[in-house]
Amino acid sequence: MKSRHILQWTVAMLLAVVTVLPAGAQYGNRGDKRYRDRYSRTNTYGDVVEIRLSEPGTLESKMPPEMVNKVRLLHIEGPMDSRDFKFLKKICDRSRCVDGRDKSVDNYIDVELERVRIMSAGSSGLFGSTGSHDVLDDALAYSSHLRSIVLPERLKRIGSNALHGCSQLEEVIMPPGVRSLGNDAFSGCHRLEFIVLPEGLQEIGQECFSGCEKLRNITIPRSVLEIGEKAFKGTALQHVTLPYGLTSLGSGAFDKTALIELDLPAATRIGDDYLGYMPKLQEIRVENGSRYYTYEDGVLYDNTGSALLLYPAGRNGVAVVPDGVETIGKYAFAGSAITAVDMPATVSTIGYRAFAESGIESVILPLSVTTVGESAFESCSRLQRAEMPGVKAMGKCAFKHCGSLKSFTTSPDITVIPQEAFEECKSLTSVKLPASVTTITMRAFKNCPAIADVEFPIGLTEIGKEAFEGCKALTAIDLPSALKSIGERAFKNCRGLSRVSLPEACKTLDKEAFRECTALAHVELGNVTSLGDNALRETAITVLVLPESVTHLGKKVAEKCKELTRIECHAVLPPTLDKESNSKIELRVPATSVSAYRSAKNWKNFKNILPLE
């Protein structure tokens, strides 16, 4: 019976190839206003074309060439494979057209594939070599003028990126048999506002509708079991009802939506316990019987109540964390409108981006808080003060981009100021670190232009890469005796810095460490052994004194130092020199080493090598 059916289908397809006539969608009431409007949109500058295929891979040969850029409504029947979709994509990605009045107009196209059967290229079976009936991955992605589409009636799965980036797509009509929507299937369809998900659908893939900015309403069928990460990110959803059987809700599924409230079914588990930033959210509730979550006063907690997972971002004023909470979860208050938070003495940990981009104005943590996670308060533009008396460990970027932050205090037990911890804190005027700090890591205070004073702890051993780069108000630094290394560009562009004295323990001055410190006129290098490329480039030094301990000089250590008149190198053996600069300047070396310098690589290029006086 099956082979007979195929034979009848093939014969029927051979009888008619191309017809110019109206066509209609079958998945709904054809009298519905949505459908009537859809067909009334065709106009005199385009036509309706119906094509019936007998073999896959023949769409291009059957399409009248003169219609490729004119067709407004294209109805296709019969078997199609990837070759046909490639040509169809070309039709849907055509350029704008010129109307009868010589004006450029949108060259939209509506496509009907209701009676299409999708095959793999070269397959002899109607459903492809895998036996499935899917819209291929990337099938019509970035079809810039596709306005609406009716999908094949036997469709089971819509592939990843199938209609991704179709910026003019307004409407999708899918058949009742669809069970799965692939990752990014409709993402970036900025004008999509109408779509009906069929009963029987079980899976909505990652970022499936991400960026569908006009999608305000959607009904999720009761059959859906899984919703992927960021599935509805950036949509205009204001209300959604999750099915009772939903077991998996991906991380950030509703990020940047307009949801005001949300009810979680008892069976649902949230990926990474993160629903996303919902700026209008006022309340979240959890169905009784959940093994994963509980809620109180519209706030989401884990099932024990010890971790606060989500505070509605639409609430303002002071947030009160109840007794018994031990952890503020990642993103818990991120982007919220709160101005302050009242924490109990039970809280010990603040998670990743817990308060990032919130409206908080001051932070006074209880002594019980020992850990502040990565980016915990990043980009809190109104934050002016932070007191962290018990914090022993702080994640990178903890206060990055807090442009109003004027002061902070930390625990006397903290040992590391982490990467980018206070970068771009433009109102910070002074830094006083506890004696326990041994390391200031890369970019910790980069581009803090108002910092005029830094009190370094006595036990500090390392200043990392770009740690104070761009701190233009810094005029003087007193480096502690324990300091061993200064990283790349650590003080670059500190234009107010006038004097630097390296301690005896400091052996490494990395490349560009003081580059563009245009007021730096006096440098004492202590017992340094290595100076990196451009370490003192574009400074105001007049005499560069290299200690006896130096063994290596990078490229152009003192390049473009306009006030430099003399270099004194006290090393008996010529240090390795990667590339000379200022070779016309007088070079003074130990009297017994003059001949050695005159024959040493790169040193020999100096024009005037004289003994030290």
Model regions and ranges:
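Bacterial N-terminal signal peptides
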Residues: T10-V20
